[in-house]
């Protein structure tokens, strides 16, 4: 299809976007894209309506599933089915993404870590499974108490770009149970060098010490690198 803003794409057009076309459509929207995340293991806000549908109804442009296990395919309050992601994409008509977590057993533990299920880990098998399920993008990140490190994220970006067909984003919104800085300019730029399509940066003030000048500087550099 011709280059078009994601904001202007119909559901039928979104369905046909390649990874490169999706990235271009996001860029063409000039910072106006809203990505909304939902924890699929929790009950929906309204019985009978998935949170993905709710987010789309309130104008989310991209949808991100957190705690989705590729082994069980469980989504709270959704009927059991073989292809829940295809079903949600049909209901919403939006690009659908997934959080996967690069656990680092050697990282400094700030707290006790949870035993993360295999279906939520950032592995080659799960990248391939995400392809089969039709996810449009991955976010390599860490939930609380999971033991995800910047070093593990960087290594996994390279792996994901080899085995996943969609876009790959990377970064941390909190420590994920490790003793390292949440926002590291060097690591965020290293993700881009490793092939990431974009990075996660906490909004100013949402994480202690995250400042406007710091975020602006990183954002400018990431954009210069194609993110």
Task: List each language-model region with its residue ranges.
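Proline-centered loop/turn at the N-terminus of a beta-strand
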Residues: 33, 95-97, 166-169, 227
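A generic, well-ordered mixed alpha/beta core segment in the N-terminal half of proteins
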Residues: 68, 83-102, 113, 117-125
């Amino acid at each position: 299809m011709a280059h078009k803003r994601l904001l202007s794409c119909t559901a039928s057009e979104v369905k046909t976007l390649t990874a490169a076309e999706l990235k271009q459509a996001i860029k063409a929207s000039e910072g106006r894209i809203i990505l909304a995340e939902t924890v699929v293991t929790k009950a929906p806000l309204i019985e009978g309506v998935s949170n993905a549908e709710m987010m789309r109804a309130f104008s989310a442009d991209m949808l991100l599933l957190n705690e989705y296990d590729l082994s069980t395919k469980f989504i709270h309050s959704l009927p059991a089915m073989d292809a829940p992601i295809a079903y949600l994409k049909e209901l919403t008509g939006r690009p659908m993404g997934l959080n996967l977590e690069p656990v680092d057993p050697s990282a400094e533990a700030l707290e006790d870590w949870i035993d993360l299920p295999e279906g939520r880990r950032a592995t080659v098998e799960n990248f391939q499974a995400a392809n089969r399920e039709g996810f449009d993008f991955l976010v390599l990140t860490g939930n609380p108490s999971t033991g995800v490190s910047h070093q593990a994220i960087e290594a996994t970006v390279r792996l994901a770009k080899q085995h996943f067909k969609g876009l790959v984003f990377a970064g941390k919104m909190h420590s994920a149970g490790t003793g390292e800085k949440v926002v590291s300019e060097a690591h965020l730029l290293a993700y881009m060098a490793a092939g990431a399509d974009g990075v996660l940066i906490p909004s100013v003030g949402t994480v202690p010490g995250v400042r406007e000048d710091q975020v602006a500087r990183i954002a400018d550099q990431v954009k210069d690198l194609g993110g």
